[in-house]
UniProtKB/Swiss-Prot annotation:
Processing and modification events after translation: N-glycosylated.
Superkingdom assignment: Eukaryota
Tissue: Kidney. Expressed in podocytes and likely vascular endothelial cells within the glomerulus.
Protein name (Swiss-Prot/TrEMBL): Podocan
Cellular component annotations (GO), alphabetically ordered: cytoplasm; extracellular space
Family indicated by similarity: Belongs to the small leucine-rich proteoglycan (SLRP) family. SLRP class V subfamily.
Organism in which the protein naturally occurs: Mus musculus
């Protein structure tokens, strides 16, 4: 019977302690200390949520009369006791001696006496997180007799000193979000089974860490020291580490050899420190032969560091002061797939034409929010996602994208691109392009030569006054078209403007100067955004060509009572949303003669300029 009960016991433990487990090697629990990541990073970056060893989806019910159980707690015959969140102010004194897994989280405990724990010699998991425990209230000998303890959770308390001694059987320890200033040699030392240690969000400085903090604990795989006051990388780190978090500290340099023994390290987080070019040398990262994820964002670097490991897949360098990418610093990293260089001080001349040569796996490049005055030459040939928004680019040349055949998403928004400076053949090679964003530029007309295979086209907040005949010709695969915030008038949108858009599902012409619902819209259209225009009427035939509409947005126009013909919507069998808020406040909707004449003159002037 003992063997048959072992699995149910394992399947009960710790679900009551905090929820689902994340895929880390050493199951632990604590606070999240991980930044918000883009979807592409999730393949390489596991969250810092310290998961518990989740072993069941059911909480233990209060045990039968034969099982002793403290008041308001839930107990099981297998030794699982849950006293979490019941406003305890004292350690429960009537715990069953066979307790294996004890949860006291989310209470008001301020102290624990050693004798209260000493009789629980079978205890394997102790969850004390989110209480009011102080170092004075947790004596050094508190855990002395817990020789079977594997998992200890003390996050979110008021500890200033770590316990001098912790049991040697520990697998995972969480001290996150305390006020720790001191770690002792045997706090984490001499624990061969220890796999994960969480110390983020404390007040640890270099002097508070012993030189041999993990002596005899060489199997630690996860170490989280983020958000402390460290100026140096801790010495003698465990060689088994595969995840090391040192972000949000005060690191200015990394001494030679700091990472030389960490050949198993896969993820290294160094963002939000004070690292400079001088603080890194050519060998800082060279021995990290397994490193796939490196985050150096939000430091003080002025160039891409040399000597980066060849194994890197994702490299964060954003939010520095980088002005140059030299010819040979990235080219050895043949596994690189994601390069994030946004929010730096890069100009096109600072990026060497050979900077990306040979990087055949590099498919995502972020260069936005820099000082690029043109598209850099020598872009990675296999790039699929290229973000160059928020720069100072004034034009697109014929050869700028001549070698990026695999490009699928191109964002050039919020630059200074004008229509005369955009070459008609600039996109001729982009036959795989699916998304093109030209919003926030200075375009007066839609660029000629738009890729025919684009699914999403954004030209919001430009200076478009008209859609030239044939501007959207051949774009049968276009699904979404955004023309928000331009100067488009109804006279400039003839029924032939949309004739080739057989697949269009979403059209956004909000924030223009339309006075009527556009004619000749494609039957495929499902969502039509017309808010913030000057539309004064909806006639009966307004939507005759668009029977598949699901959403019509007409808020904040000049519709008046009686100017909307109800029958206009009767044939729209799929209509789910009709938004006409912010209308019906203009009397009968008629304009005075002066206003009409003024608008006609403006239209004539703009049409003349366009010609």
């Amino acid at each position: 019977m003992a063997g048959s009960r072992g699995l149910p016991l394992l399947l009960l433990v710790l679900q009551l302690f905090l929820g689902p487990v994340l895929p880390v090697r050493a199951p632990v629990f604590g606070r999240s200390d991980t930044p918000t990541l883009s979807p592409e990073e999730n393949e390489f970056v596991e969250e810092e949520n310290q998961p518990v060893l989740v072993l069941s989806s059911e909480e233990p019910e209060p045990g039968p009369a034969t099982v002793d159980c403290p008041r308001d707690c839930a107990c099981s015959q297998e030794g699982v006791v849950d006293c979490g969140g019941i406003d305890l102010r004292e350690f429960p004194g009537d715990l069953p001696e066979h307790t294996n897994h004890l949860s006291l989280q989310n209470n008001q405990l301020e102290k624990i006496y050693p004798e209260e724990l000493s009789r629980l010699q079978r205890l394997e998991t102790l969850n004390l997180q989110n209480n009011r425990l102080t170092s004075r209230g947790l004596p050094e000998e508190a855990f002395e007799h817990l020789t079977s303890l594997n998992y200890l959770y003390l996050a979110n308390n008021k500890l200033t000193l770590a316990p001098r001694f912790l049991p040697n059987a520990l697998i995972s320890v969480d001290f996150a979000a305390n006020y720790l200033t001191k770690i002792y040699g045997l706090t984490f030392g001499q624990k061969p089974n220890l796999r994960s240690v969480y110390l983020h969000n404390n007040k640890l400085a270099d002097a508070g860490l012993p030189d041999h903090m993990f002596n005899g604990s060489s199997n630690v795989e996860i170490l989280i020291l983020s958000s402390n006051f460290l100026r140096h990388v801790p010495k003698h780190l465990p060689p088994a580490l595969y995840k090391l978090h040192l972000k949000n500290n005060k690191l200015e340099k990394i001494p030679p050899g700091a990472f030389s023994e960490l050949s198993n390290l896969r993820e290294l987080y160094l963002q939000n420190n004070y690292l400079t070019d001088e603080g890194l040398d050519n060998e800082t990262f060279w021995k990290l032969s397994s490193l796939e994820y490196l985050d150096l964002s939000s430091n003080n670097l002025s160039r891409v560091p040399a000597g980066l490991p060849r194994s890197l897949v994702l490299l964060h360098l954003e939010k520095n002061a980088i002005q140059s990418v030299e010819a040979d610093v990235l080219t050895p990293i043949r596994n690189l797939e994601y390069l994030l260089l946004h929010s730096n001080q890069l100009q096109a001349k600072g990026i060497h034409p050979l900077a990306f040569q040979g990087l055949k796996k590099l498919h995502t490049v972020h260069l936005y929010n820099n000082a690029l005055e043109r598209v850099p030459s020598g872009l990675p040939r296999r790039v699929r996602t290229l973000m160059i928004l928020h720069n100072q680019i004034t034009g697109i040349g014929r050869e700028d994208f001549a070698t990026t055949y695999f490009l699928e998403e191109l964002n050039l928004s919020y630059n200074r691109i004008t229509s005369p400076q955009m070459h008609r053949d600039a996109f001729r090679k982009l036959r795989l392009l699916r998304s093109l964003d030209l919003s926030g530029n200075r375009l007066q007309t839609l660029p000629p030569g738009l890729p025919k295979n684009v699914h999403v086209l954004k030209v919001k907040r430009n200076e478009l006054a008209a859609l030239a005949r044939g501007a959207l010709a051949g774009m049968a695969q276009l699904r979404e078209l955004y023309l928000t915030g331009n100067r488009l008038r109804s006279r400039a949108l003839g029924p032939r403007a949309w004739v080739d858009l057989a697949g269009l599902q979403l059209l956004d012409i909000a924030g223009n100067q339309l006075t009527e619902v556009p004619e000749g819209l494609p039957p495929s259209l499902e969502y039509l955004y017309l808010q913030n225009n000057k539309i004064s009427a909806v006639p009966a035939n307004a939507f005759d060509s668009t029977p598949n509409l699901k959403g019509i947005f007409l808020r904040f126009n000049k519709l008046a009572v009686g100017s909307v013909v109800e029958s206009a919507f009767r044939r729209l069998k799929h209509l789910q949303v009709l938004d006409i808020e912010g209308n019906f406040e203009f009397g009968n909707g008629s304009k005075d003669k002066d206003e009409e004449e003024e608008e006609e003159e403006e239209e004539e002037d703009e049409e003349e300029e366009t010609r």
